Amino acid sequence: LISDNTKCIKCMRCIQICDKVQSLSVWDVVNTGSRTTVNVSGNRPIEKADCAICGQCITHCPVGALRERDDTDKVFAALNNPDVITVVQVAPSVRAAWGEQLGMTNEQATEKRLAATLKHMGFDYVFDTNFSADLTIMEEGTEFVEKLKRRNLNKFPMFTSCCPGWVRFVKSQYPEFVDHLSTAKSPQQMFGAVTKSYFAKKADIDPARICSISIMPCVSKKEEAALPQMADAGYGQDVDIVITTRELVRMIRAESVYPMALDEVEFDSPLGEYSGAGV
């Protein structure tokens, strides 16, 4: 999350959404007179402000004074490196929103056209995060059943751990419920681990060559992918780069890609297949 006070117009939308809707009160008015601006409340660094990194302040800022960290250069570098195999996963909500900034209708901005666009941009493998969403619900379902068998030793209800913003929120605001969270990874992180293990073996690819890229709707996914415990495959982080829907649109525009001119294609197999039950 990047803050640029030189762009701030003191509209207070970030303060209102964080305080009234998210109930976190991360942002506040600081200084007086002509020096008045918006900053982290209590003059704290953002790391100590119990921010959930939900991104609501970013989406409500009308002037770009708050924005996500731009990682598009990292993706372009991976795409232009002939020694790197780029594997991208697309979240379900991204498929529903990517066409808005490109002036496309829902009928035009189909998931198959998104897959075609990513292929046209040079991604080697284009997969659907719905695949690992299926893995997540199976893991969470199994965990829940096992807890029920020993209900006297476990705490209920069991909460999902799919969203890193939600997990951060619980840890900072309701620490007494942390033990209620599922131990299952999010679909993004499951997918990253599977990409550099099962898929790499199945496709006969050296996992060290894989750059696992994730297109997600939430900036908290960037923070999640960088956590030291999210490196189970043994080849660096399970997910190397995370970009948001807005970053994806900027990349499409930078490459002068016109999605409507592309024929629709399917997501790659086998990690592009899913039941839909995990959404």
What are these regions (language model features)?
Residues 68-279:
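Iron-sulfur-associated redox domains of electron-transfer enzymes in respiratory
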